[in-house]
Amino acid sequence: MKNNIDISIITVGMNHKNFLITFLDSLYNKYPPYVSFELIYVDNCSDDGSVDFVKSNYPQVKIVQNKSLFGFGENNNRGAEIAVGKYLAIMNPDLVFLENSLNSLFDFSEKLQKDVIVAPKLLNADKTFQHSVRGFITPWVFLARFLTGGNDNTKNKTVQNYLCKNISIDQTQFIDWAIGAALFIKADLYKKLNGFDPDYFLYMEDEDLCLRAWNSGNAVVYYPSSQIIHNHLRASKKIGKKMFLHFKSLFVFFLKHGIFLTSKKKNSPITLPGN
């Protein structure tokens, strides 16, 4: 049977009911896209009534309800398994869609001659620009981040370059990678890349996916014409737990790609529309 769904939106939640209320309202009521879509909600063992809220208010949503905890990447993979859309929109529940957020991602991707991962422009709640684009990690970046205490506002040039603080925020451009809060990818490419690597429980899985996209002859693009508010979901994990997960994922990343990783970014044959 022919598939008529343009976009499968996948969102993963764990006790994020308050975020889901705004997320779903912006998607279904305030700014519903003109393209056809489905929403897949993957619930990671919530106990705050998230599932009941979705079932009661948005019965059209597909729900994957975990009986045990899974990591961010694996949860998105579980959602992708039942997705039927031409494109997958990996979207955190702490997002708020604006007018044409999804329409523009779809239209832009349709114009490209090759499959890419597209990252929209993320905004803070006050509509100011939120830095979500990154450079690939290196031992020097890791050391600089460690020595500066993870401060995003440090004047350290290595950190500033890693955080792409000098990016032209209104220019469509190739990037190394973008945070996994909002990524748009053709389902065929996601399948080709085998989705997110489940070896990462949390952190680094988005960078890993983007690196593999580059190395498979595809690309990652920042597309600022699509804008989405990102309310910065704050995990309840203690600092020690978060640091442990960061270090563990970093170890997996370097073990997989090497300490001095290489990418095929510069060899991409893809031309961006208007460039």
Where are each of the predicted segments found?
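Conserved donor NDP-sugar-binding/catalytic core segment of glycosyltransferases
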Residues: 96-132
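Active-site-adjacent helix/loop segment of glycosyltransferases
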Residues: 118, 208-275
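Glycine-rich, basic loop-to-helix element that forms the pyrophosphate-binding segment
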Residues: 66-83
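A conserved acidic beta->alpha catalytic loop
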Residues: 26, 43-51, 68
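Short, well-formed alpha-helical segments that are part of the catalytic scaffolds
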Residues: 16-31
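Short, flexible, basic/aromatic active-site loop/helix in glycosyltransferases
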Residues: 137-175
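Short aromatic/hydrophobic "clamp" motif used to bind/position activated sugar donors
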Residues: 88
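A short, conserved alpha-helix in the catalytic core of glycosyltransferases
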Residues: 168-170, 176-227
